[in-house]
Amino acid sequence: QPTVSIGLSKLREHFNDPLFVRIGNNMQPTDLSNNIYNDVHDILIRLQSINDFNLAFDPKTSNHQFNISMTDISHLVLLPKLINYLREHSPHIRLNIVPIDTHTQASMASGDIDLAIGFLPQLEAGFYQQTLFQQHYVVVANANHPRLSQKSLTHEQYASELHIDILATGGHYVVEHELQKLGVKRNILVRLPSYLGVGLVVQETDAIATIPNYLSKVLLSRGDLKILDLPYAFPEYGVKQHWHSRVHQNPSNQWLRRLCFELFSNL
């Protein structure tokens, strides 16, 4: 009641009209109230429609398309699990996966990207974020590598073996930074623009690669590889999902974030 009274007082002041007057025991609208009633009623209906639209997301029946920006590691490690869940539980929802690049921040701010997933230090400031899981680095090598028969590498082995360097955003800089701090220089055989081809190159050569642990498990299941422990203590890092404030309260985006957390937080 107080809120209504305050609102009515503001409207009376704005229109310079009482809007309602007492006639006998009843309150009756003034001529101005009658004149603006239809317009106000239409506006209220539209506002209610907008509110209902915001609450109407049903993942079981929705044909919504989500635009998700992912690192290439997320393509290999996370995306199949998300796709399989949607096929079973939300068969009409579609995904549009786009790469992480210099336009990602602007695309999230404009609403063109709903969610970004991966190790993305460039999105630490100015965006909402949630850690999905912690990640650490390991070395992968050919399962029949002629010189590496143990479960871990020595400092000397790591320095002397040929390496595959991956120039992907985020993780590449972690590896380089840690090795520089330790004064370790790798003998680089080849540099790859992404992680997508690293498994095949390792499998077919005697070069080794330093990659995130979860990726190594995926590659191990698909190729003739083995996983070795690093001789150095690299820090763990968080794989996160990031989103812009414009979609923070959006029901479909909230559902997607909850789903990603449920699917990936216990990897």
Protein language model annotation of sequence segments:
Residues R147-S149, E161-L182, Q249-N253, R257, ...:
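Secondary-structure junction motif
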Residues L78, K226-L267:
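A late-sequence structural motif
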Residues H14-F15, I36-D58:
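Alpha-helical linker/hinge and terminal dimerization helices associated
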Residues R12-P29:
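A short LG(V/I)-centered, amphipathic sequence patch enriched
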Residues D101-T104, A109-I113, F119, G170-I227:
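Hydrophobic hinge/microswitch elements
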Residues N63-L123, L192:
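Central regulatory/effector-binding core of bacterial HTH transcription factors
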Residues Y128-V138, A209, N213, S221-E236:
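Short beta-strand->loop
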Residues G126-H163:
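Flexible hinge/capping segments at coil-to-helix
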